[in-house]
Amino acid sequence: MNKCIYVVEDNPNIREIIEFLLVEEFYEVKACQNSKAFWREMNVQLPDMVILDIVLPDGNGIDICTALKENVKTRRIPVMMMSANNYLNTVKAKCAAEDFINKPFDLNDFAQRVAQFLAN
């Protein structure tokens, strides 16, 4: 069974590129454009990994990450935070995500990071 990754990204172009890349790597991908869609999917199935944009139209990835890490059922799910802004050090202080990546990012590096988290 393929590993399942939830991608939460409001920019449709970036979301589609990430989804395409991950599907090519044989992952099952649930792409969400906002936090409401993400939480709806979480009620259906827990993923093996979550990739979160920090700025979303109806909330932010930091709050989602915090909620995931505080919940016994979801705290072990690896979270990668993405941002187009260079304030990831500030985000690291507020959020217990396993990884942080700046946009734009190298697709090969991104794919390798995802593979490392899902190899365990």
Residue ranges and their predicted role:
Residues A31-M49:
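Acidic, metal-coordinating helix/loop segments flanking the phosphotransfer/catalytic sites
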Residues D53:
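Active-site residues of response regulator receiver
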